[in-house]
């Protein structure tokens, strides 16, 4: 970049800066490292050095394939070859031909990269550990770049060369980022609220519904913040972590969204489910744990913020609204025990969950739509969840009410397609 003939506000400076930070966080020297590079080195398991381990397990050359089974780490020799890399390049090239390079296809692009780069090491240096995939490195680079751009935009700073390249060391101390977390309370009680018959089906449907709901909540928030799933670090079990820009607009948006979610939760489930979120401002140096202990300190700050909200769930206005709430029926659902209009002694929600329990086993796609349909499950933001086959999904994607879809073909945790 030092000799590059590009404008001071060129986005390449953002990419260069973000790539350096991502490299700080995922590249560490090996104890017995040597000089040079080895393009045949496979991706090592992250568990090789966990808890003092000294293992040498690594992954086979593979792209993500639902028919190939799980690629478990192995002790057997693995050597990456030119043919595999050419196959990966060809796969990505062919997929890119069918993708428009705009914000609507960002998550599709991420899925393509995940499928092809998940078992390729981000570094082939003999001096470094090779347990971080190229996909994770690229994804983190994109997240950091997006955060940095929004942070500098709020400061009306357009000279990327000066701020991120010439003054890079100083910028590593700026708290450009928010490490953000969201947690749903009450999920265990919700999952185990099942009827006397069809217990396993009920458990499966309720667990799946909460997982899809969390994925939907994450996607809705990222859309509000003009970010992509590159900024999502983890989601599962009613919990998520994201890397967000440290701006006033973002802080206001996540506060408003939390209130919106809890109002919806109260309307749908009374006090059974509650959302609490927290965040900690972070610098690039803190993300790579400089000084030592600063990274874990971020999580401690987040946990304290979330714990404080859980201890004081509702403000006076929400408590008054809860006390004034009128139920639509005068009979008690035999499953969830809430007052509602019933069909077969069950409320609309429990009937829809019962129907969804069969869809979870046999339908590969689950779609978020804007219009309510029969047996559709409600989602925050006046959206609904329905099950689809491949054929019905293709038809639905041409309709105005289509929002997004999730599939479990490749992953335990649904990813948008």
Spans of features found by a protein language model:
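An active-site-proximal "capping" alpha-helix that borders the catalytic cofactor pocket
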Residues: 1
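Regulatory and interdomain segments flanking nucleotide-handling catalytic cores
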Residues: 5-417
């Amino acid at each position: 970049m030092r000799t590059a003939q590009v404008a001071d506000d060129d986005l390449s400076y953002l990419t260069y800066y973000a790539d350096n930070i991502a490299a700080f966080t995922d590249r560490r020297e090996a104890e017995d490292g040597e000089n040079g590079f080895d393009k045949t080195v496979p991706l090592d398991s992250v568990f090789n050095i966990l808890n003092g381990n000294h293992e040498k397990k690594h992954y086979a050359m593979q792209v993500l394939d639902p028919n190939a089974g799980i690629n478990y780490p192995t002790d057997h020799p693995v050597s990456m070859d030119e043919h595999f890399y050419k196959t990966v390049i060809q796969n990505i090239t062919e997929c890119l031909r069918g993708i428009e390079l705009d914000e609507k296809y960002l998550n599709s692009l991420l899925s393509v990269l995940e499928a092809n780069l998940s078992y390729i090491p981000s570094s082939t240096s003999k001096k470094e550990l090779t347990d971080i995939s190229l996909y994770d490195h690229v994804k983190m680079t994109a997240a950091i770049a997006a955060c940095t751009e929004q942070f500098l935009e709020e400061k009306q700073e357009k000279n990327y060369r000066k701020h991120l390249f010439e003054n890079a060391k100083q910028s590593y101390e700026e708290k450009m980022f928010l490490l953000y977390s969201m947690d749903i309370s009450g999920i265990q009680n919700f999952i185990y609220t099942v009827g006397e018959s069809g217990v396993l089906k009920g458990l499966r449907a309720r667990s799946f519904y909460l997982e899809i709901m969390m994925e939907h909540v994450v996607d809705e928030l990222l859309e509000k913040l003009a970010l992509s799933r590159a900024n999502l670090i983890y989601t599962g079990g009613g919990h998520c972590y994201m890397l967000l820009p440290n701006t006033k607009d973002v802080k206001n948006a996540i506060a408003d969204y939390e209130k919106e979610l809890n109002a919806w939760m109260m309307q749908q489930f009374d006090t059974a489910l509650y959302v609490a979120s927290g965040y900690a401002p972070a610098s690039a140096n803190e993300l790579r744990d400089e000084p030592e202990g600063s990274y874990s300190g971020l999580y401690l700050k987040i946990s304290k913020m979330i714990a404080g909200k859980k201890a004081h769930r509702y403000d006076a206005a929400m408590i008054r609204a809860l006390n004034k709430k009128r139920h639509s029926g005068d009979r008690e659902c035999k499953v969830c025990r809430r007052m509602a209009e019933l069909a077969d002694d069950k409320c609309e929600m429990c009937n829809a969950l019962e129907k969804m329990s069969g869809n979870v086993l046999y339908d590969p796609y689950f779609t978020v739509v804007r219009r309510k349909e029969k047996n559709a499950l409600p989602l925050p933001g006046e959206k609904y969840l329905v099950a689809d086959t491949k054929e019905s999904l293709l038809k639905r994607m041409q309709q105005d009410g289509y929002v997004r879809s999730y599939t479990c073909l490749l992953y335990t945790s649904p990813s948008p397609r």
